[in-house]
Amino acid sequence: MNIQALLSEKVRQAMIAAGAPADCEPQVRQSAKVQFGDYQANGMMAVAKKLGMAPRQLAEQVLTHLDLNGIASKVEIAGPGFINIFLDPAFLAEHVQQALASDRLGVATPEKQTIVVDYSAPNVAKEMHVGHLRSTIIGDAAVRTLEFLGHKVIRANHVGDWGTQFGMLIAWLEKQQQENAGEMELADLEGFYRDAKKHYDEDEEFAERARNYVVKLQSGDEYFREMWRKLVDITMTQNQITYDRLNVTLTRDDVMGESLYNPMLPGIVADLKAKGLAVESEGATVVFLDEFKNKEGEPMGVIIQKKDGGYLYTTTDIACAKYRYETLHADRVLYYIDSRQHQHLMQAWAIVRKAGYVPESVPLEHHMFGMMLGKDGKPFKTRAGGTVKLADLLDEALERARRLVAEKNPDMPADELEKLANAVGIGAVKYADLSKNRTTDYIFDWDNMLAFEGNTAPYMQYAYTRVLSVFRKAEIDEEQLAAAPVIIREDREAQLAARLLQFEETLTVVAREGTPHVMCAYLYDLAGLFSGFYEHCPILSAENEEVRNSRLKLAQLTAKTLKLGLDTLGIETVERM
């Protein structure tokens, strides 16, 4: 149920009947304050100006054509021409019933699209670090939301599995007796990478062999391809452990690494030359883009093939976008890549559009994100100044959560404690990130993220268990409750019901903007409204059974909405805390 969309269409039709153009925007928004109703239509200002009318005069005319019978109990004009809409309690009650009768809580499915989501993208032969956290969990929350809305989502894990470093790694692997490679763990590979690089820098004979191996690998020699595959397999097996711990939905089947696009690169360079988009410049092949200027104010040159014949990331990203449209048949492509890559992507996509590889009707969207910072406001590092491994971060989260849970539940059985600590610890790390606007940097703070107050995972998980506890105390028969009517008489009942029915609107924003923090804010607000409702509207000690059952149904929909909302974020819920 998308009340905002329903009201938008009703107000738009009334505006047209009042003389507004057919493409007018009613600008229906959820009201910020209860005294302004549940929704507010703010579109009169812009339209009245075009019509040469006072906004309030237009609003009055719109009201004469606006039929919200059975939807709103009151509609009023406020200020210079805002239209405040107060939803009818009977309308709210009816749609709460409908939401409870649906597995999807009444959420409709929009027109199905094929959406490619590019996220996570770790490098082969390196362990995942905290820099991979944001892309991985924000991208996964977007994927979960889009899939819930019924879209066909293709996860694209664009791993760094190609490049000149593989000659060096294969040469070192060979030197270390390659037959043991399959048993190596990634922790070994971290040191393995450093040792290989050290030898490459210090031993010219080794470096020469590594350079030859790159050529053989790139020419498709089966022995070197097999060695390369071992490195990829070891890395992705280890990364899968991290993905599973993080409760993200990526698997090995979602890997679409840089190597996938290699066969396309010569053809793309040749095609861009044939189209007159790419030219030779100082031995390299370059595309000059008018949209980007260099320091002299001239069109910026983007190299797509180096003087030595090598290709660049831009060339790969051009091929990647082309593949996603032509082969995967994407209607929309989302890239969860940090903000530092923005200009690079914009340049690659400008070339893609000019070449006609992806039509303008297919959006290529950079859902960029800021950095994770330490308490000092600098990039998050170990005490020694090194990069924090993601596995180490999750280990610490689990250990801190274990202590926290044991402190609050000293008699809890060990296996139950471990399960709860995992849900709280991993949930806390994810939620702390997801609850911040992805476009900004944020401070990583253990104390804040593990607090049981405020917009945190532990608070949200506790809020869910608190609602469930009402049902345990009620000892209610599910069938009996299902048949009971919902009655909304109190203001707090109406406020909670209206917020519950805004779940679909929240999902729609997350799907459109790729902003999971909007869902976090919604769920936090919902938990707060339930708390006020619970305090002021007695459930178990209600004046009669009809009111008791009605309030239990509001509590039931709250629990279902919290659980489903947290699930779209990849946050685990628990039955007891």
Swiss-Prot record:
Location in the cell: Cytoplasm
Enzyme nomenclature, EC number: 6.1.1.19
Disulfide bonds: none
PROSITE patterns: AA_TRNA_LIGASE_I
Protein's GO biological process: arginyl-tRNA aminoacylation
Catalytic activity: tRNA(Arg) + L-arginine + ATP = L-arginyl-tRNA(Arg) + AMP + diphosphate
Gene3D superfamilies: Arginyl tRNA synthetase N-terminal domain (3.30.1360.70), HUPs (3.40.50.620), Isoleucyl-tRNA Synthetase, Domain 1 (1.10.730.10)
Pfam families from the UniProt entry: Arg_tRNA_synt_N, DALR_1, tRNA-synt_1d
Residue ranges of the motif 'HIGH' region: 122-132
Subcellular location, principal: cytoplasm
Stored InterPro entries: aa-tRNA-synth_I_CS, Arg-tRNA-ligase, Arg-tRNA-synth_N, Arg-tRNA-synth_N_sf, ArgRS_core, DALR_anticod-bd, Rossmann-like_a/b/a_fold, tRNAsynth_Ia_anticodon-bd
GO MF, any single term: arginine-tRNA ligase activity
Any single GO CC term annotated in Swiss-Prot or TrEMBL for this entry: cytosol
Superkingdom assignment: Bacteria
Keyword annotations: Aminoacyl-tRNA synthetase, ATP-binding, Cytoplasm, Ligase, Nucleotide-binding, Protein biosynthesis
Family, similarity comment: Belongs to the class-I aminoacyl-tRNA synthetase family.
UniProt cross-references to PANTHER family, sorted A to Z: ARGININE--TRNA LIGASE, CYTOPLASMIC (PTHR11956:SF5), ARGINYL-TRNA SYNTHETASE (PTHR11956)
Quaternary organization: Monomer.
Protein name: Arginine--tRNA ligase
Organism name: Escherichia coli (strain K12)
